[in-house]
Amino acid sequence: MVEDKKTDDYTIEMDKMDQGSKNFEAAAPPPQPRTPPAGSISNNPILPVLAYCGSSILMTVMNKYVLSGLDFNLNFFLLCVQSIVCIVAIQTCKSCGLITYRDFSADEARKWFPITLLLIGMIYTGSKALQFLSIPVYTIFKNLTIILIAYGEVLWFGGSVTGLTLFSFGLMVLSSIIAAWADIKHAVESTGDATAKVSTLNAGYIWMLVNCLCTSSYVLGMRKRIKLTNFKDFDTLAMFYNNLLSIPVLIVLTGLMEDWSSANITRNFPPADRNNIIFAMILSGLSSVFISYTSAWCVRVTSSTTYSMVGALNKLPIALSGLIFFDAPVTFPSVSAIVVGFVSGIVYAVAKIKQNAKPKTGVLPMSNPPVSASSQSMRDSLRS
């Protein structure tokens, strides 16, 4: 499944639930495995970094391509297709012995179902926000979720925020203000119906606000729910249950709340672009799996510190992809917003690294040393 993510930005203390994790790592090797040569391609740190960045850009661009259709309104159906593709992909990987995780358990599914509902809310509102906003603005505003999660940790888990982290939050808010101002300024000054364009942007900002609230609720709720499910292979199991449990819910929602008349289907899937749209929907589902694998690969062959910095730096190419592949306005204010948002991500990553180097006392749980590759990857499958 998509989202948003989210990322890179949500380092959660998993109470060491990731110990013994097998997610997106090769199945247990036979005794006395051979150590790969130092020059092995799979151990080249450049490749996983590029693959991780490419996967993130691919998922965002594919989602925007589908959602930017003239009248696309089958968002629940899009999310359902992505969930089905993700389940097929990870089950195929399990059958081939590439990954391992526990079989389905009704008791675990029952405990995890509330989190799945929060995830559906998160990815649906994220898809609506991305539908109305440009990729650069969407990427910039997504940073605000970090602030909500941080202070949620302060309120409910007894954490604290350092001065450098607080400074990065200020930059995130500033970049969002600049981005909104640049968008509205461009809409007013451009040709056409300025009122309609501003109205569209306002709808996007509202969906983005709701998405930030849903995302923070999902991440904070997931932190508490992990203790109930006792997931050891957390990352793959969370992805498995999230997608599997969401499929019937999304089928019901798309059947009841979306227009399945032949006219609307033709409007959403015009004959000239139908195959491309279907391909993009499938590829966007696969890309969430790619992100999970490549982020785990990145941590395995580099370090958690490198991974944190890559996550921060990755925001720039994602934002730029909106300028390259879509008609996002290229103005001085919009570029300034991207730069400030990019700097805020770097400052936040540096703040996390500094906190990880200090004793754990007085530090937010989300700022403790990053968890294993498997738990790291879950955050990235949430970005959209």
Swiss-Prot record:
Keyword set includes Transmembrane helix: yes
Cytoplasmic side: 1-40, 91-110, 152-160, 222-236, 298-305, 351-384
Biased composition (Polar residues): 369-384
Transmembrane segments: 41-61, 70-90, 111-127, 135-151, 161-182, 201-221, 237-257, 277-297, 306-326, 330-350
Keyword Transport set for record: yes
Family that this chain belongs to: Belongs to the TPT transporter family. SLC35D subfamily.
Record-given protein name: GDP-mannose transporter
Gene, per the UniProt record: gmt1
Principal subcellular localisation of the protein: Golgi
A Pfam family that the UniProt record links to this protein: UAA
Places the protein is found: Golgi apparatus membrane; Cytoplasmic vesicle membrane; Endoplasmic reticulum membrane
Lipid bilayer topology: Multi-pass membrane protein
Region named Disordered: 364-384
Glycosylation sites: 264
Superkingdom of origin: Eukaryota
